[in-house]
Amino acid sequence: MNAPEPVQGKPRKRYDAGVMKYKEMGYWDADYEPKDTDLLALFRITPQDGVDPVEAAAAVAGESSTATWTVVWTDRLTACDMYRAKAYRVDPVPNNPEQFFCYVAYDLSLFEEGSIANLTASIIGNVFSFKPIKAARLEDMRFPVAYVKTFAGPSTGIIVERERLDKFGRPLLGATTKPKLGLSGRNYGRVVYEGLKGGLDFMKDDENINSQPFMHWRDRFLFVMDAVNKASAATGEVKGSYLNVTAGTMEEMYRRAEFAKSLGSVIIMVDLIVGWTCIQSMSNWCRQNDMILHLHRAGHGTYTRQKNHGVSFRVIAKWLRLAGVDHMHTGTAVGKLEGDPLTVQGYYNVCRDAYTRTDLTRGLFFDQDWASLRKVMPVASGGIHAGQMHQLISLFGDDVVLQFGGGTIGHPQGIQAGATANRVALEAMVLARNEGRDILNEGPEILRDAARWCGPLRAALDTWGDITFNYTPTDTSDFVPTASVA
């Protein structure tokens, strides 16, 4: 956008009518020192050819706070110097001369307390379609403690969940029922029973199983909870199955959640695509009803995967922790879905840290104090199997749910054998780690030793032991070690 030239050499004043450059309207301040109470955002921007990156950064700050395309006299009726967002730093992205990192500070008073919907309406509501910018991606955010404290956060959290399940010192195990569409309620319940009886802690609905002609939601809930209760009685362990309450209206979702509660379920599930207001509402319901809330990140790849445009999943994970989910899918790094190992570990930091430290190699550009919000249990799911157990535990530690869907239900000896294979592999690896062995390097040997005494594990390793998904990740961390303000 080209601003008019000054008339007869006279400099334009801030509130003269007409179009001005954003950086001249106060949306760029290279000397600005962010305050502890500022909300900070890092954008990756690709300006149009010929557009000054500083002007592009100022435009992002302006269009995500108080600016419009022309000077408006009503600015003078506000405390506009405070309400203007301020771009304060621009760095070139390494090895990409067209892209720039721009840092923007927002005054806390610009945002409604405890509302992710309001936050996202400002930060991503308008700037991503702004013509002077070819592409924009929200890479990271820092929330001030005062803002974090306006959110309730997870209703259960990792510690309380483990206490309810009475399971400590190891990752939890789960599986998604497959095929995810087409089973009758009775057959669906049978799959759940076999998986839980074989040694899994959880079974799970997939993202698109709701209430279809082949299986009404009420039938699924009834057969699943019958399976959960029978498996719990048979094993002496607390078991659960994520019942997906996603529906077309909020009222229907509450109705399904209430029915799940009446059947004794300990956990329900919603999809990311239901939206932020719905997610926060279901979190509040779970808090009031002592339920765990699992979040399936359905649809996230439409805006998180591309490196030059969209929203990084680390930002989505931060919003979800504020919104109050107890579980969220965060990637596997070794499975079938997109995920650079270091970047994925950064997502796990966001879920589990009390205080997240800046770590540029993991894509974490800001320190974040979580102000005593409970921690989210990350979930690794998608194309993983027992032969990768050493890699998964080395990458993610104990506080994670490892979900083996096809790696359980596709077992050549049946579903219960698949679950047993995963449980034995997990127990063997945790034991070896606790004995001080190098499980990352000795993992295959540890698994083969355990398989000598476990036929299901031996069959799993013979079937999938050499299966890997070695593709180059599209979303990796870029960073600038030192500032180079334009």
Swiss-Prot record:
Cofactor(s), names only, from the UniProt record: Mg(2+)
Site, Transition state stabilizer: residue positions: 336
Binding site for substrate: 126, 176, 180, 297, 329, 381
Domain of life (superkingdom): Bacteria
Cofactor note: Binds 1 Mg(2+) ion per subunit.
GO molecular function: magnesium ion binding; monooxygenase activity; ribulose-bisphosphate carboxylase activity
Positions with a binding annotation for Mg(2+): 204, 206-207
EC number(s) stated in the UniProt entry for this protein: 4.1.1.39
Catalytic reaction list: 2 (2R)-3-phosphoglycerate + 2 H(+) = D-ribulose 1,5-bisphosphate + CO2 + H2O; D-ribulose 1,5-bisphosphate + O2 = 2-phosphoglycolate + (2R)-3-phosphoglycerate + 2 H(+)
PANTHER family: RIBULOSE BISPHOSPHATE CARBOXYLASE, RIBULOSE BISPHOSPHATE CARBOXYLASE LARGE CHAIN
Function of the protein: RuBisCO catalyzes two reactions: the carboxylation of D-ribulose 1,5-bisphosphate, the primary event in carbon dioxide fixation, as well as the oxidative fragmentation of the pentose substrate. Both reactions occur simultaneously and in competition at the same active site.
Name used for this protein in its record: Ribulose bisphosphate carboxylase large chain
Gene that this polypeptide is encoded by: cbbL
